[in-house]
């Protein structure tokens, strides 16, 4: 049986995480969490250990003081990868978690920045993730900068955007040019479709390709071990996703 759209996203996230030693995942992030769990399972088969810190999970989180420890650990350089989203994301990697329109009269209002600015500055591999891929989300310029994708020359910064994964495509971020580069397009979509649904300009990789399907072994891991582990923090997501197989 072929992979569902969400299973393909989980496999894509795991691929983006290849090479990390410690990945942290914030709240309300089932697909990034599943991708991190898949990365751990795949690396274990290669004899390599990956540490996970899944906020909201009792079994897959070594923090005892929640987000306070997350920020301390990140500031000490002990987290290799983290995920951020945004109500708006622009072509320079800036994210808006506050609201649309002129602040402080933004409408709608979103949950808030929650320390995203710090994590964006210090975590080397920040992966931006949004299932929705539309001009409403991917705008030319965000209305409010919760966390800046780039900094001025001379500003010491160890972290920043590394990749963008959406329901339609995968991009990498070119920090030197401050632009996203389209590297993969998910099946049943094309380049024109991506351009129509993206409100900012982007480059295309020379080796632009269709997102590969997860192989049988990877798909079995997702549907077995990964979903079993994910159910600790996201039981409803697992039930719904397994029901669509």
Language-model segments: residues:
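Conserved phosphate- and dinucleotide-binding cores of soluble alpha/beta proteins
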Residues: 59-215
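Charged/polar, solvent-exposed surface patches and flexible loops
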Residues: 15, 37, 72, 196, ...
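Short amphipathic alpha-helical patches
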Residues: 36-40, 59, 97-98, 217-222
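Intrinsically disordered, low-complexity segments enriched in small residues
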Residues: 3-24, 160-178, 201-245
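N-terminal active-site beta-alpha-beta segment that forms phosphate/nucleotide-binding
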Residues: 1-67, 78
């Amino acid at each position: 049986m072929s992979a569902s759209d969400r299973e393909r996203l989980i496999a894509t996230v795991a691929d983006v995480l290849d090479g990390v030693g410690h990945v942290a995942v914030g709240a309300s992030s089932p697909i990034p969490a599943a991708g991190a769990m898949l990365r751990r399972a795949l690396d274990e088969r290669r004899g390599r250990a990956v540490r996970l810190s899944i906020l909201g999970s009792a079994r897959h989180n070594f923090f005892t003081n929640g987000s306070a420890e997350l920020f301390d650990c990140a500031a000490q350089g002990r987290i290799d990868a983290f995920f951020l989203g945004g109500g708006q994301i622009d072509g320079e990697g800036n994210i808006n978690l506050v609201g649309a329109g002129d602040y402080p009269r933004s409408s709608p209002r979103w949950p808030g920045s929650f320390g995203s600015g710090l994590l964006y500055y210090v975590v080397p591999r920040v992966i931006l993730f949004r299932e929705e891929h539309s001009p409403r989300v991917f705008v030319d310029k965000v209305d409010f900068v919760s966390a800046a994708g780039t900094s001025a020359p001379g500003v010491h910064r160890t972290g920043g955007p590394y990749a963008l994964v959406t329901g339609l495509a995968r991009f990498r971020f070119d920090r030197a040019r401050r632009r996203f580069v389209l590297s993969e397009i998910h099946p049943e979509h094309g380049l024109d479709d991506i351009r129509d649904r993206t409100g900012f300009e982007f480059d295309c990789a020379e080796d632009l390709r269709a997102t590969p399907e997860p192989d049988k072994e990877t798909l079995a891991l997702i549907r077995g071990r990964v979903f079993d582990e994910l159910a600790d923090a996201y039981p409803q997501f697992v039930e719904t996703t397994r029901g669509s197989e």
